[in-house]
Amino acid sequence: MNRPASASVMPTAIRTVAGGVTTSPAGLLLAAGAGRRMGTPKALVDDWLVRGVDVLAAAGCSPVVVVLGAALQKARALLQGRAVIMAAAADWSDGLSAPLRTGIDALPAGAPAAVVTLVDLPDVGERVVRRVLEYGARPATLTRATYHGRPGHPVVLGRAHWPGIIAAANGDVGARAYLARQVPALVECADLASGRDIDWPEEAISVGVWHA
């Protein structure tokens, strides 16, 4: 049953039990874009890629899947030695939906849910991910962070939603069309972060998240 956007839900534990085995939500970091406005792929900006992986892992996500595309070899090199699953989106230039589909396909079948976030959210930290996960990480979970009421990331996608998201993801809309129909539970996180995606070098430098 869909929840209205204003629904409140009671926190639950991050870990869930499936078939008698304690499992964790997977992390899914989308980092495939060319970053045309930034002038470089965002996966290569400062420590954003490594930080995104570390945030998900520190919040209890395992495994962490990273979807790469532009500057593939350079981005892979930044993650050498880290316990991540790297997935290459061959069609990354088609828009956000292509890396999202690639990432969902790379998720382990036994994961109850995936925590999806973007590489260009450098002030979204571990506490934000943990807060959103407090509201569940089960196969039916559909939860999204908001910032002063504005929907953002991370988004917790329960496994039951993955086929529908893949089917609905086209162009640059990602999971937007699916989330508009299903209406996730919303978790306010503006006291922890801005949730602002950084698109321009001047923005990154002005807020201290790129040391050019």
Segments from the language model and where they lie:
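Nucleotide phosphate-binding site architecture
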Residues: 35, 45, 162-163, 205
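Conserved nucleotide-sugar donor-binding
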Residues: 150-164, 201
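Amphipathic alpha-helical interaction/coupling elements
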Residues: 131, 160, 177-178
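Conserved alpha/beta core of the MobA/IspD/sugar-nucleotide pyrophosphorylase nucleotidyltransferase superfamily
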Residues: 3-4, 9-23, 167-212
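Nucleotide and nucleotide-moiety/phosphate-recognizing core
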Residues: 20-151, 181-189
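Short aromatic/basic micro-patch
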Residues: 123, 156, 197
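A short acidic, helix-capping loop that chelates divalent metal ions and anchors anionic groups
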Residues: 36-40, 164-165, 195
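Short beta-strand and adjoining strand-loop segment in the mid-core
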Residues: 101-103, 162-165
